[in-house]
Every structure is written in structure tokens, then in C-alpha cells.
Design a protein with these regions (language model features):
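Conserved NAD(P)H cofactor-binding loop of Rossmann-fold oxidoreductase domains
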Residues: 12-17
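Substrate-binding pocket helix/loop in short-chain dehydrogenase/reductase
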Residues: 19-21, 28-30
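Active-site loop-to-helix junction immediately N-terminal to the catalytic Tyr of the SDR YXXXK motif
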Residues: 24, 70-78, 90, 117
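Active-site helix of classical SDR
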Residues: 44, 80
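Residue(s) in the substrate-gating loop at a strand-loop-helix junction
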Residues: 64
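Active-site-adjacent segment of SDR/Rossmann-fold oxidoreductases
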Residues: 69, 90-99
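C-terminal helical subdomain
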Residues: 97-99, 103-104, 111, 120-154
Length: 154
């Protein structure tokens, strides 16, 4: 159609302020759920019908290391990233041939979000531009054979 993407990078995410689950304010918890799960679903619904129509495309839903493990004081974030893993794998089972959906753990990247959790220790991790040099070729190589696989940028 000319307007149908080959790849959708679905990277909506917020993280809660570090706190035990019972101390995370209800509104903050809801906002993390709304952005990290519902936001991802809205993007999928916006692009997937056109991709199905043309019979090709890859949806990359960004997960996290915390979508496959957990850590104290970020329970809401962990819960949403585990949800992205399951949501994406279920979506992959629903897709017609020629399409793919993958949950992608980008690895640890020096971002403001990471700084909110790790403080000055975040600076020991790669900058986004350094990460992109490795990730872009990896992501561009994704295709139908990767459908449903939990992948990581290493």
C-alpha cells in the first residue's frame, strides 16, 4: 500500500519510581500498565491490519531483561514486560504466514530510565548510539522464521 511498514518497533515504556510494590501509588502503577501494555496493543492494532493485508511484516515488541527475570522495587515494570513476552508469543500464534511478532530484550542501555534505577552506575552501560550499531542489523534481519521467538540483542 506504500504506507505499510516492513518493521514496527514497538518501544513504549515507563518505569515506576523505585519502591516496594505496596508503596507504588495506584496512579503510578496504572500509568505503567497503560503505557507498557495498552500502548503496545494500540500500536499493534494500528499497523497489523495493513501488514496482514500485504502478507508481510515484523512487529518487534520491546521487552526487557526484567521481562524474563525480576528485581526488587520495579515490580510494576517487571509485570508489564513479562506481559509483553506472553502477549507477543500469543500474537505470533495468531499471525498468518509471512508475518512475525517477536518480543525483544534490547539488553542494558544507558538511558534516563536506567539512571532512575541504577543512578550513576548506569554510565557503565552502552550509550543508545552504540547499542543501535549492533541492534539495527540484527533487527533488519528478522523475518517470518523468527515468529514468536524471545530474542535478545547481545
Amino acid at each position: 500500500t506504500g504506507m505499510t511498514p516492513d518493521i514496527v518497533l514497538n518501544n513504549a515504556a515507563l518505569i515506576n519510581r523505585n519502591a516496594p510494590l505496596w508503596r507504588v501509588p495506584t496512579g503510578e502503577f496504572s500509568q505503567v500498565i497503560d503505557v507498557n501494555i495498552k500502548g503496545v496493543v494500540h500500536v499493534i492494532r494500528s499497523f497489523l491490519p495493513a501488514m496482514i493485508e500485504v502478507g508481510s511484516g515484523v512487529i518487534v515488541n520491546f521487552s526487557s531483561g526484567w521481562g524474563r527475570s525480576t528485581s526488587a522495587e520495579v515490580a510494576p515494570y517487571c509485570a508489564t514486560k513479562w506481559a509483553i513476552e506472553g502477549l507477543t508469543q500469543a500474537l505470533a500464534q495468531e499471525l498468518p504466514a509471512g508475518l512475525a511478532a517477536v518480543p525483544l530484550n534490547p539488553g542494558i542501555i544507558h538511558t534516563e530510565m536506567l539512571q532512575s534505577c541504577f543512578g550513576s552506575g548506569a554510565a557503565t552501560y552502552p550509550e543508545p548510539s552504540e547499542w543501535a550499531r549492533r541492534a539495527v542489523p540484527f533487527i533488519l534481519g528478522l523475518g517470518p522464521g523468527d515468529n514468536g521467538q524471545s530474542l535478545s540483542v547481545s
